[in-house]
């Protein structure tokens, strides 16, 4: 069994459902320390974070990942135990195989190989791992980034190992992500009998015109390589369950995925102004998950393109699509951020998996990126 496969299987066998790290980072830290890294455990609330560095000064390259996984769901739906790595027909199955214990294992192997070849490399190689990427993302990289900012720690480049590839390893290079803004809207009405609507105020009826305006609004025409901003209503709750009672309150949850044309406070102001036009008695609670980020053309993107083309056989698509990632907390520190990882077709699903050939190639891919950025600096 190869080094990367052995380490990936060890990680998968640890049931680190967010925010539980299940000992993954402790095991990785011991291994990195043997390679010469200085490791610091940063624990906030129930979340484990590992900050490991080798070298000193600029440029600083951070390999960013997470050791937590989403719950497997019904275990009986899996072909094999989700926390017992299983290899079948050239594929490794297990929760976290693709998202993202395979990448974390590849980071470690790539770092070990790089340091063996370049023990006195220029700059700083850092690895940042959290157990709070799949959960609330409050006490993970968000909190670590605050700590690094307070210390004055600069970061030049950040490589996130999220499963970004579409159909084959290296066919997509993530160069940015949209921002995410969530809201919970509470609309007050007056409960009553459906036969006597004049004695009640139906919050659903009152809010419908506002919802229509929100969902029909054209927010923008996109921004550079970003798609246009989107608002989606995700949950609506009202009523007692009885079909003869007008509800007294309505709760609606919605989310915006927005491009750099916007910042969260401006979006919030626009939505409040729209709601106020409809005379609703409401309260609104916001949750800012992260602002958008974008890595412009430069050394990082150029090198990443060249490396990915070497591994995939064709130039990668450069994309800002998908959901959010922890890179959104590193970008505000001034870092240029990209995401490169395995195929994402099975992430969060039953029988999550990664092709063994892709897993075996990942350390070489990451090592080449590290060498091109640090050793050739």
Curated annotation (Swiss-Prot):
Binding site for Zn(2+) 2: 99, 134, 348
Pathway: Amino-acid biosynthesis; L-lysine biosynthesis via DAP pathway; LL-2,6-diaminopimelate from (S)-tetrahydrodipicolinate (succinylase route): step 3/3
Keyword Flavoprotein: no
GO biological process, one term: diaminopimelate biosynthetic process
Reactions listed under catalytic activity: N-succinyl-(2S,6S)-2,6-diaminopimelate + H2O = (2S,6S)-2,6-diaminopimelate + succinate
Class of enzymatic activity (EC top level): hydrolase
Active site (catalytic residues): 68, 133 (proton acceptor)
Record-level Gene Ontology MF annotations: acetylornithine deacetylase activity; cobalt ion binding; succinyl-diaminopimelate desuccinylase activity; zinc ion binding
Cofactor mode of binding and number, as noted: Binds 2 Zn(2+) or Co(2+) ions per subunit.
Enzyme Commission (EC) number: 3.5.1.18
Cofactor field: Zn(2+); Co(2+)
Swiss-Prot/TrEMBL keywords: Amino-acid biosynthesis, Cobalt, Diaminopimelate biosynthesis, Hydrolase, Lysine biosynthesis, Metal-binding, Zinc
Pfam families referenced in this protein's UniProt entry, alphabetically: M20_dimer, Peptidase_M20
The organism's place on the tree of life at top rank: Bacteria
Residue positions binding Zn(2+) 1: 66, 99, 162
Family membership noted in the UniProt record: Belongs to the peptidase M20A family. DapE subfamily.
Task of the protein: Catalyzes the hydrolysis of N-succinyl-L,L-diaminopimelic acid (SDAP), forming succinate and LL-2,6-diaminopimelate (DAP), an intermediate involved in the bacterial biosynthesis of lysine and meso-diaminopimelic acid, an essential component of bacterial cell walls.
PANTHER family the record matches: ACETYLORNITHINE DEACETYLASE, N-ACETYL-L-CITRULLINE DEACETYLASE
Subunit organization: Homodimer.
Protein name from the UniProt record: Succinyl-diaminopimelate desuccinylase
Organism: Xylella fastidiosa (strain Temecula1 / ATCC 700964)
């Amino acid at each position: 069994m190869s080094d990367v496969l052995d380490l990936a299987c060890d990680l998968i066998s640890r049931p680190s459902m967010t925010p539980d790290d299940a000992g993954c980072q402790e095991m990785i830290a011991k291994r990195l320390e043997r390679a010469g890294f200085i490791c610091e455990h940063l624990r906030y609330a129930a979340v484990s974070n590992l900050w490991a560095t080798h070298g000193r000064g600029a440029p600083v390259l951070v390999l960013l990942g997470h050791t937590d996984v989403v719950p497997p769901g019904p275990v009986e739906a899996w072909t094999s135990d989700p926390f017992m790595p299983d290899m079948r027909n050239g594929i490794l199955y297990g929760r976290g195989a693709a998202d993202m214990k395979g990448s974390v294992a590849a980071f470690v192997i790539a770092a070990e190989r790089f340091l063996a070849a370049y023990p006195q490399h220029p700059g700083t190689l850092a690895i940042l791992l959290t157990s709070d990427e799949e959960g609330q993302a409050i006490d993970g990289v968000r909190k670590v980034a605050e700590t690094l900012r307070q210390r004055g720690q600069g970061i030049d480049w950040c490589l996130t190992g999220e499963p970004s590839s579409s159909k084959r390893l290296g066919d997509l290079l993530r160069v940015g992500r949209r921002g995410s803004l969530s809201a919970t809207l509470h609309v007050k009405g007056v409960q009553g009998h459906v036969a006597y609507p004049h004695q009640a105020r139906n919050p659903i009826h009152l809010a419908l015109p506002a919802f229509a305006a929100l969902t029909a609004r054209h927010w923008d025409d996109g921004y550079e390589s970003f798609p246009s901003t989107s608002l989606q209503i995700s949950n609506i709750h009202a009523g007692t369950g009885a079909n003869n009672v007008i509800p007294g309150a309505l709760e609606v949850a919605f989310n915006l995925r927005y491009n750099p044309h916007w910042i969260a406070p401006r979006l919030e102001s626009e939505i409040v102004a729209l709601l106020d036009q409809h005379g609703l008695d409401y309260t609104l609670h916001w949750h800012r998950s992260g602002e958008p980020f974008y890595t412009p053309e430069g050394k990082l993107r150029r090198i990443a393109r060249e490396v990915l083309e070497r591994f995939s056989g064709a130039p990668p698509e450069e994309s800002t699509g998908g959901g959010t990632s922890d890179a959104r907390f590193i970008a505000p520190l001034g870092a240029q951020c990209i995401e490169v990882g395995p195929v994402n077709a099975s992430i969060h699903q039953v029988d999550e998996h990664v092709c063994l050939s892709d897993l075996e190639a990942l350390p070489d891919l990451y090592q080449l990126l590290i060498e091109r950025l640090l050793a050739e600096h």
